[in-house]
């Protein structure tokens, strides 16, 4: 009887350990790609030093992600090595015109989890206006990637910010597109 009880307990512990989910904190990354010119050429960037808060419930991915929050400081946008002018245009012209001096807030409200894929309803708040952006996610080789598209025209200063960016960035050819691809990436903790 004792062996059966130990075997059952071991199986339960192993099963719960296998389904426990969390992210490696040093792997978390929020990226974006905006588009410019009449040919819709992409320009990629990321946000550094994002503040994250995840659920302490790690029994499964949906529980871990539901209610997760991120606070993004627009001044921490980084457009890549050697792209100081682009980074400056984004942090000193575009985001101040879009947001003033407020942060971007993200909350994962709902999560539908399938087998290594799913959908997250992300509530994104900028300058006191919120919109829900569906993010589709996949997990492959212990890497999590969620992607969606944000329409900047949703926000009251979206058109103004896009025009300000087009005016200061000659490489835009007078066009900054309102659609921005957004992504959240992380490595799963072992």
Tell me the role of every PLM-derived stretch.
Residues 6-9, 25-27:
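Short helix-onset patch at the extreme N-terminus, typifying the N->h transition
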Residues 20-190:
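Low-complexity, acidic/polar, glycine-enriched regions of mature
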